[in-house]
Amino acid sequence: MLGKKLHVKKNDTVVVIAGKDRSKSGKVISIHPKKDGVIVEGVNVVKRHQKPRGSEQGGILEKEAPVHISNVMLLCGKCNKPVRTKTTVLEDGKKARCCVKCGESFDK
């Protein structure tokens, strides 16, 4: 079974467009296609109460929780705005994601 096609990839810079962390931006740490979620650095930080196990120390840890994929947009480096993407075919035949507004390529 093939996974879902998502508009963001790991290490992309995204902006949150809805929710309590609206207008915050950060780098995508990981993607969860089955749950339609992305974990963004410094966004949606929650406190987790960790019990001590073995050599690990317990306590209250802060970590990022997933944000739904529909609540993030890719940040264009040239426009410096959240943008939609389109897929274009490059000269060498490879597909790349590009900004709809300015045409800047996100894939290197």
Swiss-Prot record:
SUPFAM superfamilies: Translation proteins SH3-like domain
GO terms of molecular function: rRNA binding; structural constituent of ribosome
SMART domains to which the protein is assigned, alphabetical: KOW (SM00739)
Function field: One of two assembly initiator proteins, it binds directly to the 5'-end of the 23S rRNA, where it nucleates assembly of the 50S subunit.
Quaternary assembly: Part of the 50S ribosomal subunit.
NCBIfam families (alphabetical): rplX_bact
Protein name: Large ribosomal subunit protein uL24
Species of origin: Citrifermentans bemidjiense (strain ATCC BAA-1014 / DSM 16622 / JCM 12645 / Bem) (Geobacter bemidjiensis)
